[in-house]
Amino acid sequence: MSRKTPIERYRNIGISAHIDAGKTTTTERILFYTGVNHKIGEVHDGAATMDWMEQEQERGITITSAATTCFWKGMAGKFEEHRINIIDTPGHVDFTIEVERSMRVLDGAVMVYDAVGGVQPQSETVWRQANKYKVPRLAFVNKMDRTGADFLRVRQMMVDRLKANPVVIQIPIGAEEHFQGIVDLVKMKAIIWDEDKGVTFTYGEIPANLTDVCNEYREKLVEAAAEASEELMNKYLEGGELSEEEIKKAIRQRTIAGEIQPMLCGSAFKNKGVQAMLDAVVEYMPAPTDIPPVNGTDEDEAPVTRKADDNEKFSALAFKLMTDPFVGQLTFVRVYSGVLTKGDSVYNPVRGKKERIGRIVQMHANNREEVNEIRAGDIAACVGLKEVTTGETLCDPAAVVTLERMVFPESVISQAVEPKTKADQEKMGIALQRLAQEDPSFRVKTDEESGQTIIAGMGELHLEIIVDRMKREFGVEANVGKPQVAYRETIRKTVEEAEGKFVRQSGGKGQYGHVVLKLEPQEAGKGFEFVDAIKGGVVPREYIPAVEKGVVEALTQGVLAGYPVVDVKVTLHFGSYHDVDSNEMAFKMAAIFGFKEGARKANPVILEPMMAVEVETPEDYAGNVMGDLSSRRGMVQGMDDMIGGGKSIKAEVPLSEMFGYSTTLRSMSQGRATYTMEFKHYAEAPRNVAEAIVAARAK
């Protein structure tokens, strides 16, 4: 089966927006227009199409599907058919991980801004992540019909806040309730959409009151295009006009290189401008073949690349897992190279496992289509994969490659959860397992002692949302404990002789174990080490493993506050035994007593997790942010200027002081600062803090 659409006519894009900028309406309108134009040859009344639009709104497919495929021939129907895959990017960036995972598989992004609110904090965060993955983008200023809409003010905000380089390619005709259409600065024509949901439109002359502003921005557009090459620049400087073709080609080249961002406008709600934005996606966004080959490593860890080509060996990245009520688990994949056919076996190098693809489905706006194969550049969902988690590679078993992994941080905060009823018990286990598969930054374990289920994640909000999803998606009601920090204990002093005795001899078979241990602190991160230094058989060989077992058990509960003990070296160097009464149990108990006895004398201390915190903030708030971090026992380690303005402040702060930080930071910076936090290392807690921790545990 050959390709239906050549890969050069593919566009894999994300539509990214602050919560209120109108992303859903924009996406729905895209699906509506592409749906209509795809079926343009069929005779049907508008009602049928609109029906599915209403139904879409009820079913919310645009919102739930991680990737939707649609087709576009241009608003005048003059393009060859292009295939546009829209990857959903979350509107809420409390989970930067979600945005990162979509940015990782996109080739280009449409940034939607509200014509009134402009560039909001959330937009800044998404912009930084797009910078990190070098994603080409264009800007669509939506809601031009709102009171207070101001297109050129949003342009200025993009320059000031994002340090973007927007190139205006459309000027709005009117604004607020007078918004009628746009002027296309490449064609220098006005475009007015009809009232039939914007399906038809007419070209006209530029309104007289806009001539000056259109000429000014047309000049800037041509200048931006001329900078694409020396040849064009010379032509421009010699006063030659650049053709429409030359301008488009140059703007495309510079957009894909990340040097400029074409800027458009419209009102999705009023059916104006979305069609021209789709044209811009086709004209200025990259095809999979326009971006560099993807990097990975082979089985010997040697670097390899995979080109976007059907003839290469198959490689893909699983970027999202979803549970579908009809087909079970869907694994959304982006194919980077080669072809995948239904029934093929794929290899997952991260887990070292082969799995078979049951079915492959592609989501279209109003239906899902089963397909037999997917090729380089495609995005689809696979059914039948059981072992894959987000961010893992799938590849041809005969040509193993591991694509660059998304990095998921270690969890640092935990909470106990317990089901409210017996009926919730079983469902909770299934729910937590599913959620952990979908989100690699979330972990589940069972507390040995209390038997409680402990969930661990990246922060308070993360765990709140997990508990909320258990209730919404799996119907599990759970009670949640208070967030807990994972403290540790260690020792600071060497104790030469720590004696442990376990003796029970009162008639009949007794118990007798006796050990003398030496305890020494190890350097941080070295872990636990056990040394057998018994001479002359004072402790028989067969009991030595029991002594080590006892010490390991004692390590699980420190003497200060019962936290696990780390970085200790224990040497067994003396002891005694009884021919009849000694046994493994007795020596294990003796070792536990000996270790606890020694630990008390060895200057025990509490260790707390230290977090590397990085705050990105507009300059005005930098002083307050630094002061606040210091008040949280933070060590500010440096402040850098950010590409794109603002300051990046790096600090090391104890995790226990970071609870509630997102709320404080939000109010301190009016929502404009963002922060990331990841575990760095354990450090000794100051005495007053340690005393408070011990007192809290003693309650």
Swiss-Prot record:
Pfam families: EFG_C, EFG_III, EFG_IV, GTP_EFTU, GTP_EFTU_D2. Residues 8-289 form the tr-type G domain. Keywords: Cytoplasm, Elongation factor, GTP-binding, Nucleotide-binding, Protein biosynthesis. GO terms for molecular function: GTP binding; GTPase activity; guanosine tetraphosphate binding; translation elongation factor activity. GO terms for cellular component: cytoplasm. GTP binds at residues 17-24, 88-92, 142-145. It is found in: Cytoplasm. GO terms for biological process: ribosome disassembly. InterPro entries: EFG_II, EFG_III, EFG_III/V, EFG_IV, EFG_V, EFG_V-like, EFTu-like_2, G_TR_CS. Catalyzes the GTP-dependent ribosomal translocation step during translation elongation. During this step, the ribosome changes from the pre-translocational (PRE) to the post-translocational (POST) state as the newly formed A-site-bound peptidyl-tRNA and P-site-bound deacylated tRNA move to the P and E sites, respectively. Catalyzes the coordinated movement of the two tRNA molecules, the mRNA and conformational changes in the ribosome. Belongs to the TRAFAC class translation factor GTPase superfamily. Classic translation factor GTPase family. EF-G/EF-2 subfamily. This is Elongation factor G.
